[in-house]
Amino acid sequence: MTNKLTPKEKDFYYKSIIPIADEARKEFMGDYEPINNSFETIEQLGFLVLRFPSRGDSDLSGFFMRKSKNNCIYINTNQTLGRQFTSIWHEYYHYYTNDGQGLSYVSKVTTDPSEFKADTFAGCILMPEKIVKQYIEINNILLNRISYIELIKMQNYFRVSLAALLVRLIQIYPNEKDVLQQRFAITKNNLNAITRLQNYTMQANGDTRLIQPTNEVYIPESFYDNLENNLNNNRISKEKAYELLKVIEELFNATE
């Protein structure tokens, strides 16, 4: 059985990730801008993003691969949209730092240093400390008695899962850990917790897509349009076009 990372190890890795995430974020976002659509942002950074349900292990969150000079990210849509947004920045970490490789599994975040750092990086990208503190100040939130409604509104602002938000708040406000840990109760994978989370989300006028698997299949039309256009204009050979289509096939096969 693999040992879980200790609190001391997590704190060490977290502190090492902060400057890396801050530097990475400056390249594509303003200091006080939340990321409204992580998929679009990653595509604008030049990545081929494919999203579809894993035909294998539901614990698979995604993976990054370089193929035929293309940077490709696969995201498993069997998971909630909030988790998918974390997963795509998790994979961006593997690209950006070259730390870790292969398939990413949610369960490994607590045991594997590279996976923990990748999830921590994603949290820092999606919820930078300065924006979190600004949000809490503007909305007059008292963390020692924060309500589920306040948390869900905050979750929707940052476009993350509730669990990811709570993890990030504990990182930024360790003195409020005891109270915040109690709020994990409605993030559990059981009927009572799921029902409560859905009810609170509707009360807060939140986006229920963030708390549900989307199970969508997404391959950008631009991929096929660009491929056809380049082929018709003799910018690439038939062999190259076939090679690119094989990339798609390999991504599908890797999720089985």
Description of each model-found segment:
Residues 1-256:
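Active-site hotspot residues in diverse enzymes, especially metal/ion-binding acidic/histidine motifs
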